[in-house]
Each structure stands twice: as C-alpha cells, then as structure tokens.
Amino acid sequence: AIMTTVSGTNIREIPDIIDLVVAQKVDIFAFGRYCPTSFEKSTHIEPLEYRDFLERIWQKFEQYKDCGTTFNLKDHLWTLFLYEKGLFRIPDATDADTIYDGCHCGDCHMTILPTGGVMACRRFDSPVGNLFREHIHHIYNGEKMNAYRQYEKFKKCSRCELLRFCRGCPAVAYGYTHDFFAADPQCWKEINQNYE
C-alpha cells in the first residue's frame, strides 16, 4: 500500500504518482491532505482548486478501476464531491443525532503514544489522557474526549446537510487556524457565509 500527502507544493504530481502506483501493481493507494503546523502559505490549496483536483483524481480512479489497485477515498471531502455528483445520497432512515461517517476524531478512534499519552487525533496536538494514569474507558468517555464531540460547534459544517457524514478534516482546519471547529480550508461548499 502507498499513501501520500497532498499540499500546494505537490498537488500537480499526484496524477503521475497514481500512474506509477498502477504500473507497479500496488494493491492500495490513498492520500491525505497536509496538516500545517503553523500559518504556512506556500502549501495552501484553494477550495475550488482542491475540488478540481478531486475531479481529475476521480477520472484517474475511473480510468484504472479494473487495474487491481484499490483507491481508498480517505479524505472526507470525497463525500462532498460524490454527493455533488449524485454518487452519495444521505440515506432516508437516519437518526439526526448519529454520526455515520466523516472525521472520526472523538468518535471512534484515538492515538496511543509510546509514553502512554493518548491523543484524540494523530494529526494535531490533541491530548486527552495517559494510559499509565487512567483506564482507556475513562479517557474515551471523559471530558477531554467529549470536547471533540460537540458537532454543533463546527462553524460551517454544523449548518451543512453532510454534517453526520463529512466534517472535512478538522485537523487541517486546526493547522491553519488553531481552531478545531473552524471551516475546513479546502471545503468549497457554499453555506451561509455568516458562519464565523
């Protein structure tokens, strides 16, 4: 399997990487977006540029759909992309209080470090406890982890019909703004602009 990171620095190289992955008969390919650790400008991708990128990558995936490589749609903005194309539909029988997919931070994953430290997400500094001092059950159900489950606090996503299925990447948003609940900087969906 091969996974790569996409940023403004290498976005134009990804289609060639896909060609190489297929030529080398790699079994799985995926990519994730770069999470800046400061307010870097050189790596930024504009929202519509990212949407156009996903369109080009989707066409590549379709071109190679029978090649034997599984293309993992890891980035949660694929949900928005597929929704706009009519390839993802919100199921009729869904519970308004249930998170079905999208970012799993605080929901169904955590990162355990060799020091025993537990992070809500591996992609940004999000300490929620330490296994050497607390039981994992208490960490998972604790106040610090619950802070990441406040879906109504998402400044843009909380008003989007895809809230329970997407939420973009809050770690990327955090890398740009130091606010976990800020709008995903590559999300192109137009929502009432008064979300800040």
PLM region descriptions:
Residues A1-G106, T111-R123, P127:
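Radical SAM enzyme [4Fe-4S]-AdoMet core and its adjacent flexible, acidic
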Residues V118, R122-E196:
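Flexible mid-to-C-terminal extensions adjoining Fe-S/redox cofactors in radical SAM and related proteins
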